[in-house]
């Protein structure tokens, strides 16, 4: 195996271990990120964590399209977005999470969380995706 390929495999494995060690991926729309990992919830993007996975790259772009539906809206003075179809937004977000879980299988927990901008999100916890 050429050194460069060996190095790429090592980098891929290191990347995967970093997110697996975190044990959980939380998908939550925010203005800068959609994916949060680790105990401290550091923001990241799936294609950065899994650069050599075509299925993840496809999901990354699907999550960005989903995220833009919310971030293109202007929040009110209270920081919430009131004129928005949150039911459809969450349905799509959970659907994408299920696709992500089907790719990652049992390697990590995938969870969904409603963003602060949803007026109905008060006290809403994590939804674990099975």
PLM segments and residue spans:
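Intrinsic low-complexity, intrinsically disordered or marginally ordered coil/linker segments
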Residues: 1-130
């Amino acid at each position: 195996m050429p050194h460069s390929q060996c190095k790429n495999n090592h980098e891929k494995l290191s990347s995967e271990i970093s997110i697996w060690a975190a044990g959980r991926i939380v998908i939550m729309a925010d203005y800068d990120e959609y994916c949060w990992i680790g105990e401290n919830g550091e923001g990241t993007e799936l294609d950065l964590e899994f650069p050599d996975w075509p299925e993840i790259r496809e999901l990354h772009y699907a999550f960005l399209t989903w995220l833009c539906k919310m971030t293109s809206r202007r929040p009110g003075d209270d920081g919430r977005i009131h004129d928005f179809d949150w039911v459809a937004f969450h349905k799509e977000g959970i659907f994408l999470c299920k696709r992500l879980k089907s790719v990652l299988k049992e390697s990590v927990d995938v969870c969904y969380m409603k963003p602060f901008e949803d007026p109905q999100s008060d006290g809403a916890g994590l939804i674990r995706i099975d």
